[in-house]
Amino acid sequence: MSWAHNYRKVKVEYESEDSWEEEQVGQALGRPLDSATVDITMDPNQIQALIDNAVRQALSQQQSQFQTQLNSLAARVQSLQVEAPQIKIYEKVSVNPDVRCDIPLDIIKSVPEFSGTQDEYVAWRQSAIYAYELFKPYNGSSAHYQAVAILRNKIRGAAGALLVSHNTVLNFDAILARLDCTYSDKTSLRLLRQGLEMVRQGDLPLMQYYDEVEKKLTLVTNKIVMTHEQEGADLLNAEVRADALHAFISGLKKALRAVVFPAQPKDLPSALALAREAEASIERSMFANSYAKAVEERAHSGANGKSRFQGKPNKEEQGQDRNPHFTKRPKNNGQTNKDTQAQAPQPMEVDSSSRFRQRTEHYQNHPNESNAFKRRNSSERSTGPRRQRLNNVVQEAPKQKDPKEEYEKTAKAAVEEIDSENEYAPSDDSLNFLGGAPGCRSLNDGWLGEP
């Protein structure tokens, strides 16, 4: 097919109108077009060839770009110098006769022992470093060797077993390196400082909160001492202490913070002193308020009591007006009634033949010899009326009879018997139904009168 006489109708839709316009695209093919318009039908093979050509061009362009980037990365990698970690080898200390040192070993002997407690390691490490610095310039001398040996012998317990298991040589730096690897804090400094800034008092007492801040600060300072040189450690420690002071004030309760923050303390002990003074003043004010409130309530209740009883005459004062020699005492009616009911006499059930019988003269002159030398037990020491009341309670409780009726009945029978048996009546015509008179017998046939 010749492309010289082929045309294609392309309809272009404009945004403003719905009309269509035919556009000739033959010039895009690089062929001159005639005025005649014909329809074009393309073969699928030709369409596939066009698509393959476009894909190949795009892939070649991307491949060239990727190749350029790979070449630049390769050049950068070649320019980098990767340094492998260097392993430091420690040698055992030895004695050189040419090196002399006359410094005494007292400071080395004063270093405390270390038994493997992690909380004590940083303090022991600092004291050991301070003591060893005096002998460090005399490496090879006998004093230097003795100093390192003494420090090694100060390490005992789990820490000493650790050095033995790793076959650590007799070298101060080697000993510290091995102990640092085991007992140093592996937490990052950033996390430790973040934990210090997040401390809050909450419901903790003031001193407990201060101790918590000190613990967090100690962890941070120990980490700085372990990972930095002396000069850098001093600068970082000063910065961390300022952060700890700010965290302590910010974490206080609102009432304490309102007092401590305007004072601008310069260190933690000063801030603690201000906080304790503020806490004491708050407690005093709270106590004063509660005490004043209690006094006010007491005064108010006293005034109400006076107004309640005001205007009522006093019976005792009225009695004094009538006769000053006779006054009525206030009585507790409830308690008196209870005592009266408890002490009310109860009649005793005794045999009618032995009722109100006096002891004979023979018994008065010759008491029972069998009981003369016997010791009276607790039951015999009790008084007659009380003993009879107990017996009455035991006997009459199951019957549930009225005490008044029983008393009247017993009294009537006793009077009738006295009238019929005058020979048994006492000479003074006295009657006692409680068994307290001479000649009266109880239920257990024991005399309760005078001996």
Curated annotation (Swiss-Prot):
It comes from the Eukaryota. Keywords: Transposable element, Virion. Residues 332-344 have a biased composition (Polar residues). The keyword Membrane does not apply. It is found in: Virion. Residues 298-407, 419-451 are annotated as: Disordered. Residues 313-324, 352-364, 398-407 have a biased composition (Basic and acidic residues). This is Retrovirus-related Gag polyprotein from transposon gypsy. It comes from Drosophila melanogaster. The gene is gag.
